[in-house]
Amino acid sequence: MSTIENMASEFSDVIKSKRIFAPEDAYMEHVEIILVGNGPYVLFDSGYSIQKDEVVDWIRKETNGTLEKFILTHQHYDHSGNVKSVCDNFSVPCHAHPIEIDLVKEREPEISFIPIEEKFVVNIGEINLKAIFTPGHSPGHLTFWWEEERILIGGDNILTDTTTAVTPPLGNLALYIKSLEKVLDMGPKLIFPGHGKPIQNPEERINHLLSHRNKREKQVLEVLLKNDSTLEEVAKHIYRNLREDQLRFGVNMIKSIIEKLKEEKKITYENGICKVL
């Protein structure tokens, strides 16, 4: 058994993760939904709607048909696709940040929500999980902190094997970096992410992600120091291996960097052209 599995297995009686595989056209291959508790139980996120029967069956099996609370880390469809199904099958409302509630209600206005914000405490038996506001990936993204054990239910703030997508208009790179630094300062020893296996080396992983973001910013500035460029030109230079059908995503990633650099008054972005000041 690996070190990661050993660390996660210490808490396997109170934290259970279920991998829900994505539809073929999805960007991510899978998403993790997480149950915390050993009676009562709280569910974090709900997976893709295409797998609603699998999700409901798993929750019913693990909780013996009871679920006390249901919480959404953020509104992206891979996490919120089964909100209505979970609410209906287990007679629970969904808790989420007010910003995320508004975004989900644009798609499904009939869902019952309870708004929660930073410092809200989720009580599950003897476990207390504090809501931590970590915007950037989504504007109302929340993570949940089990302080006594230094364990974080991380949503998409920090992922195991890939970088988190931060794309405008709802993604904000400056806020995302601040959220990474905020979690780093908390000193977690284990993170259960929204995609991938538990992260048993959070400090190393977060520092790697911060370094990666800094490297990307420098690459963008290097491109613009040579030539004023469009977003697409910058994306093609930096993401050389992207297929044409993936380029739009690359352009959006570059746009998040451009918006941060513009806010910091390092560049201008006017009429579709990026230029170093």
What are these regions (language model features)?
Residues 4-63, 142-160:
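Conserved beta-strand hairpin/beta-sheet module of binuclear metal-dependent hydrolase folds
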Residues 13-21, 102-104, 125-127:
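Short Pro/Gly-enriched beta-strand edge/turn motifs at strand-loop
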Residues 25, 48-125:
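Active-site HxH/HxHxD metal-binding segment of metal-dependent hydrolases
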Residues 26-29, 114-116, 135-138:
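A short catalytic or substrate-binding loop motif that flags glycine-/basic-rich loops and adjacent residues
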Residues 41, 48-50, 128-219:
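Metallo-beta-lactamase
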Residues 62-65, 122-127, 147-148, 185-186, ...:
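Glycine-rich phosphate-binding loop signature in dinucleotide/nucleotide-binding domains
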Residues 80, 176, 180, 254:
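Aromatic/hydrophobic pocket-lining residues that form the small-molecule binding cavity
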Residues 223-277:
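C-terminal regulatory/interaction regions
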